[in-house]
Amino acid sequence: MLRTMTVGVGLLALACVLLVPSAATAQQTSAIAGIVRDTSGAVLPGVTVEAASPALIEKVRTVVTDDQGRYNIVDLRPGTYAVTFTLAGFNTMKREGVVLTSGFTAAVNADLPVGTLQETVTVSGETPLVDTQNVRRQTVLTSDLLDALPTSTKNWATIVEVTPGFSGSFADVAGQLNQNLGNAYHGKTGTKRQFDGMSIDHASGNVGYLVNSNMIQEVSLQSSGISAESNADGSVVNMIPKEGGNLYSGNISGLYTSDRFEASNLNDDLRARGLTTVSKILKIYDTGVTFGGPIRKDKLWFFSSFREWGNGHLMAGNFWNKTQGTPFYTPDLSRPGDRFQWYESKAVRVTWQASRRNKFNFFSDVADDCLCRAIGALGSAPEAGLAFHFRPTGLYQGDWTMPINSKLLLEGGASLTITHWPTFLNPGVQPTDISIIELSNNFRYNASATYAYKRATDRGAQRFSVSYVTGTHAYKVGMQIEEAVSDVGTYVQGDVNYSFRNGVPTSITQYATPYRAIDRTRADMGVYFQDQWAVRRLTLNYGLRYDYFNGHIDASHIPAPASGWVPARDFAAVSGVPAWKDINPRFGASYDLFGDGKTALKMSIGRYVAKTGTAVASANNPISTSVNTVTRTWTDTNDNYAPDCDLNNRGTNGECGPMSDANFGGFSPTTHWADDVLRGYGVRNSNWDFSTEVQRQLGSGSRSPRATTATGTATSPRRTIC
């Protein structure tokens, strides 16, 4: 029954997504552009064009057509707009009901009749569905669709699931078993996640902030034709937050389900074969409150949300250990293995029109999350699974826009994603319990192999840009920079793991813990120039981007462990791991085939550098490249399940064989990265991406454009280790 309902919801989601126009501009602001003529077909320069919407705190944005009769109103939020055209000696024309989704440029043209009286002609036409100017391929989910989706799919991966061309691991329909999913679009990996145009990935590049869906107005995914404003070699998922308004509004919602609504296929035949439990949902819940409105009308708005959601599951064939704390695993059939997760978000966004020209947005989400027992189905006993508590965690952002005049726009923003997620012991596990792995079935019990007493993977991001927009050109220069830190402290209980085969001890693994490694991204920076040039029915999109990436490893002092197996160790700081520089051109063209804004031919080509976190610095950290683990054989001659030998003695003694590496605690001489791989121009992994597309609006109203797309990707390989 659950599967049937899920398929139905999935088909509904896919159908709704296909009703949304595709294409985009850079930081997911929308635009309205077009040409103004008189009734004879001659272009009209100097026409005042106004775009008004309740979505704008400043109420209206105004530009003037250039000498080609073209105009382009940029930096618009998603919403419904009325566009007014005014010129002395002509009747005023007003176009109502223009609906903008994020990243979409709506073509709104006008033919002004000559008139001596101040008369306004109001036109309510269909909203353009084909973006004839941008070449970026985009899919959009609106807030209405997000509200309709089940709790299990209210995360960033939702849009990936319903976008054709993606492959990989997708969201589990039974309740967010994995919020951190891998995927690829036409073979391109490296998905970047953004909130309001700034990264929310943590230091290693995975999901750093779990989004409160009640704060989201739209979610967009760009998959090809990405402009010079991004260095993504894969896709980009961007979440557009909601804003308050001049009217107070709010919402209270609550969803809950339990195992009482779930069927089971466990029958007598399966029980006879030894299956006693099945995987099932214990509960899924989602509660939320939103409230927003004016603090001061047309001046200061707010929108806030509190949301708490989570789930619980039972894992088939997995049981808690009845004899926990001993060398033995005895499944407790009365306690099936379970997994619980909960998430809490307290978010608020403030929009401030500080002056006629200066607008600020501030966002804060103080979150508290727990992946309580992140176990697999059969890989370990529940007590040996890892459990993470995300605290402190959250997202903090601020941005500023300043239109100097109708042509010149300044923008800036900063973001901080905080992700601290140390592990904690599962119920019943004592600090003295040693992790044991049964080699006959690769099953671990008693404790986890390793733990993290500290894990901070924070990321900061900043951006600044200057746009100069006429009707014919949309020039933009800007800079983006990100910094990240991965601060991880690792320990192993007792500094040892045991390996058994069929319950008999066979070997010991010794660890040189605890140790703490700090890896940084000092700069993931991009400087770019781009232009959108409209020439009759042809629009050229071209740009150039310079990317610079600099990694760093902090100096560290590791005291001698309590076991005394290795001495205190000191490691010097290492800079420029890596230090990469790249020049990345972008070019695209969009052609309005019939001039009616309903058919567009598009192509794009560009070079994109690979998404990179702190992984390269971590791989070159002298702590990571040291010999931190060794194994030795163990023959338990007296069956007491305790190694009767001196583990400080690196040679054969008592019941223990020699250490597998006599350099325990020292450097490994066999692995290092070549300098020409770590530093220089053009050595970073990169893609050349080529895309062609035909978009045709097949109907009006809710009917969508249809597209056929061919994408080719060429990957530039590089050596990594020598």
Regions found by a protein language model. Give the residues of each.
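Transmembrane beta-barrel wall of Gram-negative outer-membrane proteins
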Residues: 249, 279-370, 388-415, 585
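Periplasm-facing N-terminal accessory domains of Gram-negative outer-membrane beta-barrel systems
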Residues: 2-10, 15-142
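Residues on the lipid-exposed face of transmembrane beta-strands in outer-membrane beta-barrel proteins
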Residues: 123, 239, 289-293, 348-352, ...
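Outer-membrane beta-barrel channels and translocator barrels
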Residues: 242-244, 284, 296-298, 309, ...
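Solvent-exposed loop/turn elements at secondary-structure boundaries
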Residues: 169, 555-584, 588-722
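Periplasmic N-terminal accessory/gating domains of Gram-negative outer-membrane beta-barrel systems
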Residues: 66, 90-245, 249, 262, ...
